[in-house]
Structure formats: C-alpha cells, structure tokens
C-alpha cells in the first residue's frame, strides 16, 4: 500500500511580497539564454561541504534579514574565499515552497511544491520542513565552516536551524558502504543542460531544483553481506566500480531503479552526495543532494526505489538505509536571488490569499493509475522538463 502525501514545512508569519524581473545576459547555454548566471549547481564535486536547512521565523523582520543575506552573499563569499581562491568556495541557496510565498510573491516556479512523502511497506521517504537550504562547499572544510559561521551569525534571530550536516570526501569518492558514489554524473555542458531551467519556464530560466535527503546506514548489517550480494544490490562492482552486465544485474538494483528514460534517452541529474558520520554514536550516513531542471525525475527515481518498479520490486539498499529527512527547494538564478533583497509594496489581496490560507504550500495529490502503481515504470514519452 502506497501512501503519498505532503506535509507543510512551517507556520508562516506575514511578510511583504515582491515582484521580480530577470535580466538577460549573453554567453549562457541555449536553454538559459533569457537569464543571467545560474548558481553553481553544476560545479565539480569537492572534498568538503556543509548542508544547512532552516525555517524562517514569523514576521517581516525575519524575511528582511533573509533578503539582506541574499544581497550580501556574494560579498561574504569573497571575504572568506580570498584566503585560498583555488579552494573554490561556493554556496548554493535554495528556497522552499512556503518560503517562496513569503519572500517572492504570487509568481512561482512551475515545479516548486512541498516534497511528497512516500511510504510503502516498511520503507518511508519522509517529508520534512525546510524554508532555506545552504549548500556550502570547497576543497577545504575550514572555509566552509567560516562561511557558515558568518551566515548563521547574520541570521541568528531570523531562522531556526532544522538540520546541519558536515560532509567529507571518503577515499576515491566512496560512500560509507564502500561503493563509489556519483559515477554517472554528467559533466560540462551536459551537467548544465541537466540542471538549468530553460524555455519550459521562461520567467525562472537559469534556476534549478534540488532535493535533499539525509540517509543513515546500518553499516554492521551491510558489512555482514557477501561482497557479491552487495554488488547485486548496488548494480556495480565494489572495488573496480564497473556496472554489472544486464544479464546478471537484478531489476531491483539501485542503479537500475534510478535510471529514468524519456523518449529513449536517459534523463540525467547532478548528484553531489557526501558521506557524514559520528563514530561515537554509530551514525554512518550519506547526504543525498540532487540537482535537476525539474523535480519530477528525482521524485520518480525515489518512487522506483521506495515503491518499486513494478511495485514491490524495490531498492534493497533501503533494507539497510533509512531516510531521515526530505525537502525540495527551488534554486534561483543569481540575478533573481539578488533581486529578492528588495520587497515590493505589499498587495493586500495577496496577503489574504497567501501562505496562511488553507492548503497553501501543499503538494497536489498524486494520481494513482488503476494498477496501483504511480506510473513510473518506463517513462518513455513522459516529459520530465516542466
């Protein structure tokens, strides 16, 4: 039995809404010609990262503090990053569905909604609160930590932290269950095309979507499995990181269920997953973070994993991994993010029908086909780019 629902991120205080204007700039990918520079969602993997998820406190002052951070973020990055430019310090900002209503007004990105909860048997992809995501990364952890400290000092009275994870590179980009992570990531222009919104949503072209989940692993149980069984669950060899041949790879393998096709071609996303852990507590985890130009492919990958394709043929990794969080964010282009710093005059009508109205920020119900599945199986002919 599949139960799919959405939960609100947090209660909203009233904030002045604003209007936005996207300014064109040259030199961007074909699908993003209408906007200026995207945030660094397609940047290469780094050796250190901090993931901060927070909710905005009620009230206009809290919104104002968050907007001020948006306008000053580039300066903060320069102030911290100058110590080692080669470390490539960056910070991607994502905005949750309900926070968008508070910060940006009625115009919404087409794919922005509350992350849909997925439950099937004992497997549960939870939906958890989150108004703002900060994905801070660099080749040096000290730079990440310094930037996070400056940001949280600025926002101390305006936000409440929901989750903070410190990620690190583990050997040759392996996760804590011993397999290389991110092998199939696109690079260069292919990464940009996979992550940056184009003409399908022209008002928000240059933006992106990101889904984050914090997984904890039963490492003892996993390590008790023979290596060959682990490889069949993942779909790749453990030592050499070679994909198993289709003749021997189960249809429930992780990399089989997370392969999504559209019109005969694989739909790609960019994963920037990082291991994390606390040895004394026995916490060993993977922070999943996936960027895409539409949230639909990632949501369907997760449905394949938790429900199965077909239903019941689920990802056996979930017998050893538990999702502790799950949140969807929109990642504005750089000029759109900076423009959010200046609220427009509040529209009384918008305030009456805004975030505090019944159903605001809720995801639409997921239509279930008559066979009981979510229609995920083969996605050929299904448009992923909204």
Descriptions of predicted regions:
Residues 3-14:
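Short, positively charged and aromatic/hydrophobic N-terminal segments
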Residues 15-376, 381-385:
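Long, histidine/aromatic-enriched segments associated with O2/redox biology
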């Amino acid at each position: 039995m599949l139960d799919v629902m959405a939960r609100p991120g947090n209660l909203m205080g009233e904030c002045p809404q604003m209007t936005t204007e996207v300014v064109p700039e040259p030199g961007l990918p074909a699908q993003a010609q209408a906007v200026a520079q995207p945030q660094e969602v397609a940047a290469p993997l780094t050796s250190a990262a901090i993931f901060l998820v927070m909710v905005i406190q009620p009230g206009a002052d809290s919104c104002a503090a968050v907007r001020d951070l948006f306008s000053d973020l580039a300066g903060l990055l320069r102030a911290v990053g100058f110590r080692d430019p080669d470390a490539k310090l960056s910070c991607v900002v994502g905005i949750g569905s309900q926070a968008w209503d508070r910060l940006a007004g009625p115009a919404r990105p087409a794919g922005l909604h509350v992350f849909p909860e997925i439950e099937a048997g004992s497997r549960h992809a939870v939906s958890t609160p989150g108004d703002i995501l900060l994905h801070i990364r660099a080749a040096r952890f000290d730079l990440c930590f310094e930037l996070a400290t400056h940001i949280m000092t600025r926002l101390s009275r305006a936000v409440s932290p929901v989750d903070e994870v410190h990620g690190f590179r583990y050997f040759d980009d392996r996760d804590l269950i011993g397999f290389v992570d991110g092998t199939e990531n696109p690079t260069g222009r292919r990464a940009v095309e996979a992550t940056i919104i184009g003409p399908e949503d022209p008002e928000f072209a240059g933006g992106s979507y990101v889904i984050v989940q914090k997984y904890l692993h039963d490492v003892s149980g996993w390590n008790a499995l023979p290596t060959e069984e682990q490889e069949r669950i993942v779909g790749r060899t453990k030592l050499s990181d070679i994909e198993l041949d289709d003749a021997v790879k189960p249809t429930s393998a992780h990399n089989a269920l997370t392969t999504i096709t559209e019109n005969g071609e694989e739909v790609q996303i960019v994963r920037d997953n990082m291991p994390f852990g606390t040895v004394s507590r026995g916490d060993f985890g993977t922070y999943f973070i996936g960027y895409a130009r539409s949230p639909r492919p990632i949501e369907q990958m997760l449905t394949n994993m938790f429900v199965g394709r077909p239903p019941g043929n689920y990802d056996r990794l979930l017998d050893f991994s538990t999702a502790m969080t799950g949140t969807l964010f929109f990642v504005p282009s750089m000029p759109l993010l900076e423009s959010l710093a200046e609220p427009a005059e509040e529209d009384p009508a918008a305030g009456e029908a805004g975030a505090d109205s019944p159903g605001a920020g809720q995801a639409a119900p997921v239509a279930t086909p008559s066979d009981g599945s979510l229609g995920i199986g083969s996605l050929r002919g299904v448009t992923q780019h909204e």
